[in-house]
């Protein structure tokens, strides 16, 4: 079948099971081929082909509302709703988004990117439906990994209490990104092997009521028997206790069983949870055999071999520099523990986990819990290293404020994927952390200019015992610089002059330092002398350095790959104003006041005007005397 000719899912209504099975093969082949060129979330989508087709066949989108938790598994949904022809642009600038996008299709009723939000949003839609007295199905699809998130459990509790009509699809592949952890995962494991409790209890009631005269009474008396049967057949039926009708587990790759179960769910009043067992990566051997999450989301790859197509790496990944330095220090300090919310592979903590399994804690998709747990460990003299992506740290903001900073606890937060991350787009850009951490009392915030300084700042953080300290580091690789063998502590709040200059100054840090240095060199050739400063401590700032610099009365440009509002540049302007300097001398470059879409980091930087050319032009406009343009 030519998938690019699909306009909407209505064609599925008249297809036979054998035809649907052929469509499944076509979709898997299409995904494997297309994603080999663009990269993307290949394994999750290969696992939900039959489930997605079954949902679109039996329900009527967009009237009936599908909410894809996290959203990375929505590619099949996009194909069935007329977007197959756009897959060549997947996750590219102004191309097809890798997550549901409301402006992209009327079938995308809820935007996602972070986990565990679908149930709460579905509850809101269902309540709105009931208040408006309309009739449509609301169907959140959530994975077993996302179900470990506290927000999802809060929503389950509320939905079950209110007895709201809703069909929750639990897509259980025993794996979110990395293997799942936690007691709820174990409950699901028991359910997988328990068989279909709900079918048995309903058939029992039907048979009892067929007995003449006494059948109804026997059936009523049997209610307690059914409750006992529930525990006998389904050990630990968590969802029934919350007020859901539990259906399953059902084979998520068997159309007959999917249709039977979903049709039953459609007729059932109140909240229903359909437990679907799927195989992540189904249909592509390298993805099927992956047990650690390598094929969850990938770049381009070679279909035949399963080898990833990667540029030759000339420098270590930032995540590896940080995690391996923490591991090195942990060998001589038993107080150091590493904590991750379900991202051990992404944060490069596999080596730490292998060497110190008792001191490596993966809490699952539970950022709030991870953060407060780290605080609790710090009260007992441990040195917790909390490795967390910038975008996911947003989810633990109150815990950082209330539990870490307020108590001034020695927690080292490694803020991975800081700055623009590219293809994952709006939901994953790490551009807000400076603004929401800089104003917190007791917080120290740093970002290194290269991987050598990065390892020294990790050492600095582990030596620091006066409160919380956080290190920002980017996605991708470092610069390939020489790495010192001996680690050293860098004085807290100290900046570094990278290039002397007399006519203007650039204050920046991290990934924008090469941009600033290149701009300064070009300006130098044009006769403009520009100082470049490595402002590696975003907080506290080097106040002595700032006093000296502002006292020279020269233009100052701050550059940051983070949002301007409340950012580093704002801090410099505030310092100038509060200390009687001419704050108009300070201008800022950074992320504007909007969400940044998906695309390559290079393209996105060009789009927002954060380039070497833009820096050169800005410095020219800031210097009063006319200069030859570089």
UniProtKB/Swiss-Prot annotation:
Disulfide bonds: none annotated. Pfam families: DXP_synthase_N, Transket_pyr, Transketolase_C. Binds 1 Mg(2+) ion per subunit. Binds 1 thiamine pyrophosphate per subunit. GO terms for molecular function: 1-deoxy-D-xylulose-5-phosphate synthase activity; magnesium ion binding; thiamine pyrophosphate binding. It comes from the Bacteria. Mg(2+) binds at residues 144, 173. This is 1-deoxy-D-xylulose-5-phosphate synthase. It comes from Bacillus cereus (strain ATCC 10987 / NRS 248). The lineage of its organism: Bacteria, Bacillati, Bacillota, Bacilli, Bacillales. The gene is dxs.
């Amino acid at each position: 079948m030519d998938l690019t000719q699909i306009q909407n899912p209505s064609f599925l209504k008249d297809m036979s099971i054998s035809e649907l099975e052929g469509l499944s093969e076509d979709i898997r082949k299409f995904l494997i081929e297309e994603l080999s060129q663009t990269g993307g979330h290949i394994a999750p989508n290969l696992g939900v082909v039959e489930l997605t087709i079954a949902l679109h066949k039996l329900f009527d989108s967009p009237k009936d509302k599908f909410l894809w938790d996290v959203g990375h598994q929505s590619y099949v949904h996009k194909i069935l709703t007329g977007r197959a022809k756009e897959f060549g642009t997947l996750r590219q600038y102004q191309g097809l988004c890798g997550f549901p996008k409301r402006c992209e299709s009327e079938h995308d009723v809820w935007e996602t990117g972070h986990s565990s939000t679908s149930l709460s949003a579905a509850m809101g839609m269902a309540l709105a439906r009931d208040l408006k007295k309309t009739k449509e199905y609301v169907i959140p699809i959530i994975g077993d990994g996302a179900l470990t998130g506290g927000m999802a459990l809060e929503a389950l509790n509320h939905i079950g209490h209110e007895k709201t009509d809703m069909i929750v699809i639990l897509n259980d592949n025993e794996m979110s990104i990395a293997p799942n952890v936690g007691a709820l995962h174990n409950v699901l494991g028991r359910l997988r092997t328990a068989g279909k409790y709900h079918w048995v209890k309903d058939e029992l009631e039907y048979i009892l009521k067929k007995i003449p005269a006494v059948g109804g009474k026997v059936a009523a008396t049997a209610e307690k028997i059914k409750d006992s049967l529930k525990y006998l057949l389904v050990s630990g039926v968590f969802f029934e206790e919350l007020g859901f009708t539990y259906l399953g587990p059902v084979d998520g790759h068997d159309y007959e069983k999917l249709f039977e179960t979903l049709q039953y769910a459609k007729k059932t009043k109140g909240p229903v949870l359909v437990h679907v067992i799927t195989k992540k990566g189904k249909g592509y051997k390298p993805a099927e055999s992956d047990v650690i999450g390598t094929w969850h989301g990938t770049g381009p790859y070679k279909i035949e071999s399963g080898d990833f197509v990667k540029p030759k790496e000339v420098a270590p990944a930032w995540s590896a520099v940080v995690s391996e330095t923490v591991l090195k220090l942990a060998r001589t300090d038993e107080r150091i523990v590493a904590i991750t919310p379900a991202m051990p592979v992404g944060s490069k903590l596999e080596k730490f986990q292998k060497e110190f399994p008792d001191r490596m804690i993966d809490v699952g998709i539970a950022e709030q819990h991870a953060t407060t747990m780290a605080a609790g460990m710090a009260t007992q003299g441990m040195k917790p290293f909390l490795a967390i992506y910038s975008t996911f740290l947003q989810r633990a903001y109150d815990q950082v404020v209330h539990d870490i900073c307020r108590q001034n606890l020695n927690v080292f937060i490694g803020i991975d994927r800081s700055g623009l991350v590219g293809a994952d787009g709006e939901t994953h850009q790490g551009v807000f952390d400076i603004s929401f951490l800089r104003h917190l009392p007791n917080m120290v915030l740093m970002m290194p200019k290269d991987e050598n300084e990065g390892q020294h700042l990790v050492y600095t953080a582990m030596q620091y015992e006066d409160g919380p300290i956080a290190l920002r580091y980017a996605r991708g690789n470092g610069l390939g610089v020489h790495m010192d063998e001996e680690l050293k502590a860098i004085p807290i709040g100290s900046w570094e002059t990278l290039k002397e200059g007399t006519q203007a100054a650039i204050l920046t840090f991290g990934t924008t330092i090469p941009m600033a240095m290149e701009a300064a060199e070009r300006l130098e050739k044009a006769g403009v002398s520009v100082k470049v400063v490595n402002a590696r401590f975003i907080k506290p700032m080097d106040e002595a350095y700032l006093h000296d610099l502002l006292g020279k009365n020269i233009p100052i440009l701050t550059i940051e790959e983070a949002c301007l509002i409340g950012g580093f540049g704002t801090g410099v302007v505030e310092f100038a104003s509060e200390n009687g300097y001419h704050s108009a001398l300070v201008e800022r470059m950074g992320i504007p006041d909007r969400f940044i879409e998906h695309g390559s980091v290079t393209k996105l930087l060009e789009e927002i005007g954060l380039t070497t050319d833009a820096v050169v032009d800005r410095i020219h406009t800031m210097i009063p005397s006319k200069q030859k343009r570089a």
